[in-house]
Amino acid sequence: MVAATELFADRGFTGTTVDAIAVRARVNKAMINYHFAGKHGLYTAILRRDFGWALARLAEQRLEPMRADARLAQFVAVFGDLHQRRPGLSAMMLREAMSGGRHLDPTLLPHLRRIFEAVQSIVAQGVAEGTFRDVDPLFMHHTVVGCLAFFFAARPLRDRMISEGVVQTAALDPKRFIAHVQELLARGLAKE
């Protein structure tokens, strides 16, 4: 799955072939087709695994009583951790979003809905507690998921710009970026 994720991230769904995946993974093409029923099955399995991992962490989070601001910080941490564990996922999802979800298996839509519902629930809790100002949950979802996905997907370009001296900074620590997003959201949502 690692080789396929790298190729889907780099070339997109359409630009990736089972032959290329087999070569990169050093496996027989027939094995991929047998285990995943082809390229689309493998693509779906990757996304199902990663969405499932995130949803399991969010379900654990819901069991703990905590304020909405802490819950939102944990949501950001879960997705930051996911993008660090699965480096190609960010680019895969951005490509999928740009294609209008053309290659997204319909069985994955409930996973995406549950991720959005987690944000919606956090926003509603924060407004009810009086700790968050009233914001659109869909905007909040795109703010959180979008900035994390872009940060991790843009790493190759960012690294190139740093190595070529275009940007004068050291490589950016993902944990610092996640903390930065958490702080921005906490301050930006705080009820005045």
Question: Language-model segments: which ranges?
Answer:
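Helix-turn-helix
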Residues: A3, L7-G41, A45-I46
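Amphipathic alpha-helical segments used for helix-helix packing
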Residues: R71, Q84-P106, R155-S163
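Hydrophobic alpha-helical connector segments
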Residues: A59-A91, P137-V144, K175-I178
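All-alpha amphipathic helical-bundle segments outside canonical DNA-binding/catalytic cores
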Residues: A70, P106-H111, V127-T143
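C-terminal peripheral helix-coil segments that are non-catalytic and often amphipathic
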Residues: V78-D81, R85, R113-R133, C147-E192
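Short coil/turn segments at alpha/beta junctions that flank glycine-rich nucleotide-binding fingerprints
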Residues: D10-T14, P65, R86, E129
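Short, basic, alpha-helical segments at the C-terminal edge of helix-turn-helix-like DNA-binding modules
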Residues: R48-W53
